[in-house]
Amino acid sequence: SAASDVYKRQHDCSGVLRRQLNWKEEHKSAVWTAIVRMKIKKQMEFLSELCCPQSELLKSYVDGTELNDRTNREGHAAKVYFDALFGLSFKRGDKTFLNGALNYGYTILLSAFNREIAGLGFNTQLGLAHKSEFNQFNLSCDLVEPFRVIVDKAVFGKDNCQFTPDFKRYLCDILNREIKIDDKYFVVNDAIGIYAKSVFNALEDGDTSKIKEYEF
């Protein structure tokens, strides 16, 4: 019956939430470190694709990322990466077309992660590294990090575009682009599900080799 279906869903969700609340701190640290490494690696791969020499520096950051990114390799990598992509005058946070386009694309990605994580029964507010009590989507903000490069690729070279409805549609369409994950091609929207489930599996026992990495 419909009532028993609702009850089962609620029961499943409470079971998932219990699992989430029981994740060990050392497992969360290991998984967050793996996510940071993957993010920097994707940035490195994009710069390498563009033949930017800075990709070598990012490679050293991947290798040098410590547990919980104690030495802030993520922050250092972001500076090098955005300078290489958009020039030394580019600053994240400035009110420019590029920043507006990046933010719009990132929001689309984050929404897809929110849907996936909530659909699996996890609480999006209980993050690994993002822990703001005012952010309902801390966990999504953690998991989305390596996927941001997909937006960066879509926005790169579009400096002369206008923020038209067509351009917004172009950015929305990133969820329908194909990427490779688990040795098969999937649209980004489906790849997010495969990746998110693999992260949650890794959080159960701290085995970060379970995390599935996508390729462009």
Give a label for each model feature.
Residues 9-25:
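A charged helix-plus-loop insertion that forms the helical arch/lid used to bind
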Residues 92-95, 118-132, 157:
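Short acidic alpha-helical/loop segments enriched in Asp/Glu that coordinate divalent cations
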Residues 101-126:
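Conserved mixed alpha/beta catalytic, RNA-binding, or beta-rich assembly cores of soluble enzyme
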Residues 2-7:
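Short, small-residue-biased leader/transition segments that mark boundaries at the very start
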Residues 158-216:
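Charge-biased C-terminal accessory regions appended to nucleic-acid-, cytoskeletal NTPase
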Residues 23-97:
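Internal, conserved structured core segments that host functional sites
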Residues 130-139, 143:
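Small-residue-rich helix-loop
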Residues 141-160:
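A structural-propensity feature for long, helix-poor, extended segments
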